Every structure is written in structure tokens, then in C-alpha cells.
Regions:
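Rossmann-fold cofactor-recognition segment
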Residues: 32-49
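A glycine-rich helix->loop->beta "capping" turn
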Residues: 55-69, 74-79, 103-105, 179
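Catalytic loop of short-chain dehydrogenase/reductase
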Residues: 72-73, 77, 100-176, 187-188
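C-terminal helical subdomain
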Residues: 90, 152-154, 158-161, 182, ...
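Hydrophobic structural elements of the Rossmann-like NAD(P)H-binding subdomain
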Residues: 68, 108-110, 180-183, 193, ...
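Canonical Rossmann dinucleotide-binding motif of NAD(H)/NADP(H)-dependent dehydrogenases/reductases
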Residues: 1-30
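Short, flexible catalytic-loop segment of classical short-chain dehydrogenase/reductase
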Residues: 184-195, 199, 204
Length: 267
């Protein structure tokens, strides 16, 4: 049976690769991006998110089987959080009623391996509290210093992965039968990274931060395949996970013990 997918960031990169794969499988895709997609909208502000959700729901006839949120930027500016966090969360929440109309609703978002890098705890907390003005103000402060501007990106992705973990087990999502998960790529070769990887110096800088011992840099298709499975009817029980599809970067950086936490119970 043909399913209807809504994909943000569908004009390029992981979003385009995912849309192409789904269309090859005979699925219906409603893309959202600034230009060149079925729905053209700017997800950096609340009005654009609301417009995108309304237009996608209308095109889908009120029933959406899966939402895949790929839209994002990596610039060291506050707008990164507006798009990467609020542009994802508000879009998903606005599309939830249409997802509930599906017999097998699914949702997935694109986080990043950068979620493991240094962040601004204040910005992450502001995002999770839904305080966009404060989050953007904190982002502007980070952007004013070249040594901290990058934390706009890592903080936006950390907040997104934490939101997925919280929301996935809530009555709104789990209670509605909607598996919600995230995928965290390593260094994906897209328009976002191509210029940086084009020089030996740039590539060395990236590889030092994101070591990928398995197959090195990855094509968008490697993430698309995972997103397609996560949002298929075959995924009945995976929820709240950020899956690091990153060539082993997470395993290199965090090592073999990711089960230790401050209040872990004693055996």
C-alpha cells in the first residue's frame, strides 16, 4: 500500500536522497524546503512552520503516514537553532494530528554526531523549555565569539536528540502509537560539508573532530536507508533512540561504556 511521507529539507542532501529512495519504492512524498518542493516554506520562524504544516496536511488530504525532518543548517549563528530545533519540533507537533489518522504513523528526525561535542547547556535548556527568544539570544552571544559560535550547531542537535527521547515516550507520541526516533550522521558529503572537505586542511580538521574508521565519509544515501526503515511499518517498537550512523565515530569518541550515569543503580 502506498504511504504518504512529508520530508523537510527535501530539496538537497539527506532529505533529497530519502525522498528519491521512497519515490523509487512507489511511495508518495510531499517535500518541504525553501524552493523546489511541493511545499515552499521558511522553517526559521513560527509562521513559516505553521504554513508548512498546513500546506502539507492539505496536500495529504488530512492523513500523513510518516514525517522525516531533515531540514537544517550548520552555520555558527543563532538561526541554526531556529531551524534545527524549533523548525523540527514545531513542524512535527503541528503534523501530529495528521499522523494520528494513519494506521501506521512514524516520525524520524536528523540529529548529528555533533550532539556529542561541546554545547551551551543554557541554550539546550532554553530550547527544551520552548523558549525560542531566549535560545536565539543565547545563540547570538555564542556567535559573537568565533571560538564558541560552533556551539549553536552542536547545541541545537543535542537539544533535538534530548527532545526526541522525552517526547517519544509521552502520551502524545507513544500514546498515539507513533514511533519517534533520530539518526545522527557522521561526516556526510553534502552541500553543507563539500567546501570544507575540498581542502586537505579542512578535511583534516573535520576528521579530527569526527573520526570515521569504517568507510570514512558517507553519502546521503547511507542515512536515507535508515530513515526509510525507521518510518516504515516494520518499525513497531524502536522509540526515543538517536542512532549514530557515523562510521564508528561515536564508538571511537565515547568508547565502550555508554552505560555509566551519575545515579545508575548498583548491582
Amino acid at each position: 500500500m502506498t504511504r504518504t511521507y512529508v520530508i523537510s529539507g527535501a530539496a538537497s542532501g539527506i532529505g533529497a536522497a530519502t525522498a528519491a529512495r521512497l519515490r523509487e519504492e512507489g511511495q508518495r512524498v510531499i517535500g518541504i524546503d525553501l524552493t523546489g518542493t511541493e511545499v515552499e516554506a521558511d522553517l526559521s520562524h513560527p509562521a513559516g512552520r505553521a504554513e508548512a504544516a498546513h500546506a502539507a496536511t492539505e496536500l495529504a488530504g488530512g492523513r500523513i503516514d510518516a514525517v522525516i525532518a531533515c531540514a537544517g543548517i550548520s552555520a555558527p549563528i543563532a538561526k541554526t537553532t531556529a531551524i534545527n530545533y524549533f523548525g523540527v519540533v514545531e513542524l512535527l507537533e503541528a503534523l501530529l494530528p495528521a499522523l494520528r489518522a494513519s494506521d501506521a504513523p512514524r516520525a524520524a528526525v536528523v540529529s548529528s554526531m555533533a550532539s556529542l561535542q561541546p554545547v551551551s547547556a543554557l541554550l539546550v535548556d532554553a530550547a527544551l523549555a520552548g523558549d525560542e527568544p531566549r535560545a536565539l539570544a543565547l545563540g547570538d552571544e555564542l556567535a559573537s565569539d568565533p571560538s564558541t559560535g560552533f556551539r549553536n550547531y552542536s547545541s541545537s542537535k543535542r537539544a533535538l536528540s534530548r527532545w526526541v527521547r522525552r517526547a517519544s515516550v509521552s502520551e502524545a507520541w507513544a500514546g498515539s502509537g507513533v514511533p519517534l526516533n533520530a539518526v545522527a550522521p557522521g561526516t556526510d558529503v553534502t552541500a553543507m560539508t563539500r567546501d570544507l572537505l575540498a581542502t586537505p586542511e579542512g578535511a583534516a580538521h573535520v576528521d579530527a573532530a569526527v573520526p570515521m574508521p569504517l568507510n570514512h565519509h558517507q553519502p546521503p544515501a547511507s542515512i536515507a536507508a535508515l530513515l526509510v526503515w525507521l518510518t516504515s511499518p516494520a518499525n513497531t517498537h524502536m522509540a526515543g533512540q538517536t542512532i549514530y550512523c557515523d562510521g564508528g565515530a561515536d564508538a571511537v569518541l565515547r568508547g565502550d561504556d555508554v552505560w555509566s550515569w551519575a545515579d545508575s543503580p548498583e548491582a
